């Protein structure tokens, strides 16, 4: 997922009472990355760490949600134990002839696996997260609608010393009366495992909530012998072959139902800034 011909950018888009912001800038400098790693008690950060990149969705009242690399890495440690059992030993055996072997397999989650689902914004008011059985209507998303705004932001990427890839990216598309966001963590450890953690966020302009769906999938490479190897490097293609290991359905309710009138979008007010 390397970015070719990269240029820093700060894109903003207004969707009714929502301000959408996508900031894309350069990889963190080594000194800054080392300092941040120390603050987070991590041996090192991903090779390509975009510490200032962010995709933010914020209401005029102040509440909202954003997606950034620093907060995503803060929850990596919680996956350490399960990763060591599921992957690290097998990876080490499969790469016993690698000169980087001892360097890569360290006592921390060296794949940066994260179940991050976003950072809630707001001081006095925040989105209220509650479990739900409601699901995103995928049929609506398949409908042909004008794309008013689209952005994709890479948050971090690491090539695992040329033995795979670990990456986190987020993209959003805005239609006339709704927006849809996908945050994707993708891991491929060559010859060992493929893992994908997806967070989908959907909001319709006349609703006082967003729907958030988190899905975790993974499979050992040995169980994917029926899949053409070239697909291993294509997240969109390999996804259908990975068994689901966890799903979480949530409703992100607005802080006050009194805001219902404020969320009705005036399509004339859907503009890029």
From Swiss-Prot:
Primary location recorded for the protein, binned into one broad class: cytoplasm
Record key words, sorted: Cytoplasm
InterPro entries: Phosphatase_reg/MetRdx, TIP41-like
Location of the protein in the cell: Cytoplasm
Any Pfam family the entry gives: TIP41
Record flagged with keyword Cytoplasm: yes
Recorded GO CC terms: cytoplasm
Cited function: May be a regulator of serine/threonine-protein phosphatases 2A (PP2A) and 4 (PP4).
Protein family (similarity comment): Belongs to the TIP41 family.
Protein name: TIP41-like protein
Encoding gene (name): tiprl
């Amino acid at each position: 997922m390397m970015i070719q011909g990269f240029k820093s950018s700060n894109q903003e888009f207004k969707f009714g009472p929502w301000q959408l912001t996508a900031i894309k800038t350069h990889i963190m400098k080594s000194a800054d990355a080392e300092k941040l790693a120390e603050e987070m008690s991590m041996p090192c950060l991903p090779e390509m760490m975009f510490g200032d990149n962010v995709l933010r969705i914020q209401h005029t009242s102040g509440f909202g949600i954003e997606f950034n690399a620093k907060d995503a890495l803060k929850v990596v440690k919680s996956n350490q134990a399960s990763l060591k059992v599921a992957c690290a030993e097998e990876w080490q055996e499969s790469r016993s002839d690698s000169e980087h072997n001892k360097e890569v397999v360290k006592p921390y989650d060296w794949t940066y696996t994260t179940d991050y689902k976003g950072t809630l914004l707001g001081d006095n008011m925040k989105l209220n997260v509650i479990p739900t059985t409601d699901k995103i209507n995928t049929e609506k998303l398949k409908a042909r609608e004008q794309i008013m705004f689209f952005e994709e932001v890479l948050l971090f990427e690491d090539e695992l010393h040329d033995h795979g890839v670990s990456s986190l990216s987020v993209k959003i598309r805005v239609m006339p009366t709704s927006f849809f966001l996908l945050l994707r963590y993708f891991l491929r450890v060559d010859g060992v495992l493929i893992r994908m953690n997806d967070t989908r966020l959907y909001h319709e302009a006349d609703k006082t909530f967003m729907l958030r769906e988190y899905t975790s999938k993974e499979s050992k490479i040995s169980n994917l012998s029926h899949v053409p190897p070239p697909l291993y490097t294509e997240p969109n293609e390999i996804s259908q072959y990975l068994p689901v290991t966890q799903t979480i359905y949530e409703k992100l309710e607005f802080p006050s139902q009194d805001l219902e009138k404020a969320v009705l979008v005036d399509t004339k007010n859907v503009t890029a800034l």
